[in-house]
């Protein structure tokens, strides 16, 4: 027999590990992207080699730039996987130090769990919406994730690339370069912290 609903709620909202309830964030992401799991058909130009384009970017950036963090692989993901990737790639931020007037209301007994759950719900919503609608993180310019994987939201990537009358290899190269640079900047947390603390 499975747990009663109150035990499930308690387990979901009980968080002793960190400043963010990551399990709650994952569950919300999964709920938002539950209808988005099937990968769409491939791009019309079957000659696109994602690995090859990624290696070109990697070699060029290694030649001219030196970053402590940079992606080592590229992966096509479903919207659900993309949301989960986003959650994993923002865990390097120090969410313990976030203070805002809204979150400071939850001091006292159970206050940290409440703050952790609110942040988990917010990040779960953000991850789910990114998975469902976003073609990449670089368009925001403020959330700087850190990951060894350059994630491509396959569904939204295909939709965007097919909107242009241009060579799909050139478009892919431009898109992946911008995403690659966003991941290389993942060591910087200041823009994101300023938003969270205001």
Regions picked out by a protein language model, each given a short descriptive name:
Residues 50-155:
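Auxiliary, metal-adjacent structural segments of Zn-dependent hydrolase domains
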Residues 156-177:
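Short pre-active-site segment immediately N-terminal to the catalytic Zn-binding motif
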Residues 40-41, 111-114, 167:
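Short coil/turn segments at secondary-structure junctions
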Residues 3-6, 120, 124, 193:
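Alpha-helix initiation and N-capping motif
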Residues 151-152, 167-171, 191-196:
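Cation-handling catalytic/transport regions enriched in His/Asp/Glu
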Residues 1-72:
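A generic N-terminal leader/anchor concept
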Residues 179-196:
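Catalytic Zn2+-binding segment of zinc metalloproteases
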């Amino acid at each position: 027999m499975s747990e009663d609903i109150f035990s499930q709620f308690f387990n979901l909202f009980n968080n002793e590990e960190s400043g963010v309830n990551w399990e709650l964030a994952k569950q919300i992401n999964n709920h938002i992207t539950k209808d988005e799991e099937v990968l769409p058909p491939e791009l019309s130009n079957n000659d696109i080699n994602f690995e090859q384009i990624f290696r070109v970017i990697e070699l060029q950036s290694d030649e001219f730039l030196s970053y402590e963090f940079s992606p080592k692989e590229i992966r096509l993901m479903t919207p659900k996987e993309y949301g989960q990737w986003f959650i994993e790639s923002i865990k390097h931020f120090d969410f313990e130090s976030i203070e805002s007037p809204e979150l400071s209301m939850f001091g006292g007994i159970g206050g940290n769990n409440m703050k952790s759950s609110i942040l988990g719900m917010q990040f779960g919503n953000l991850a789910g919406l990114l998975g469902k609608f976003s073609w990449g993180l670089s368009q925001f310019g403020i959330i700087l994730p850190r990951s060894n994987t350059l994630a491509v939201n396959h569904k939204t990537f295909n939709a965007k690339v097919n909107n242009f009358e241009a060579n799909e290899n050139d478009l892919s190269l431009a898109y992946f370069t911008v995403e690659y640079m966003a991941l290389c900047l993942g060591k910087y947390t200041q823009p994101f912290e300023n938003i969270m603390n205001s």
